[in-house]
Curated annotation (Swiss-Prot):
Signal peptide residues on this chain, from the entry's feature table: 1-43
This protein's UniProt keywords: Host membrane, Membrane, Signal, Transmembrane, Transmembrane helix
One GO CC term, this protein: membrane
Superkingdom: Viruses
Keyword Iron recorded: no
Organism: Feline coronavirus (strain FIPV WSU-79/1146)
Record family assignment: Belongs to the coronaviruses ns7/ns7a protein family.
Protein name as catalogued: Non-structural protein 7a
Localization in the cell: Host membrane
Listed transmembrane segments: 76-96
InterPro entries, A to Z: Corona_7 (IPR003449)
Keyword Transmembrane found: yes
Pfam families in alphabetical order: Corona_7
Amino acid sequence: MLVFVHAVLVTALILLLIGRIQLLERLLLSHLLNLTTVSNVLGVPDSSLRVNCLQLLKPDCLDFNILHKVLAETRLLVVVLRVIFLVLLGFSCYTLLGALF
């Protein structure tokens, strides 16, 4: 029965971790969209104050490949955690049914 309780606790922690990683994924997508928007705005020749302020914020090299790689890694991590979650959930159900019968 103690193994079942541990499996349930680990399953709950994995669910919380999946939620946090999905939040990280949304933040990465938002950051990628912001960089794309800044890059598009800075590509337009304009001498307005807004573009001048954005030029101060522009990094030397907008490397979108790094953000795409991190985004892919977070999605892969979510998939792996979901597989672990399903295995633990199956083990918990099997243990509970074994304890009942």
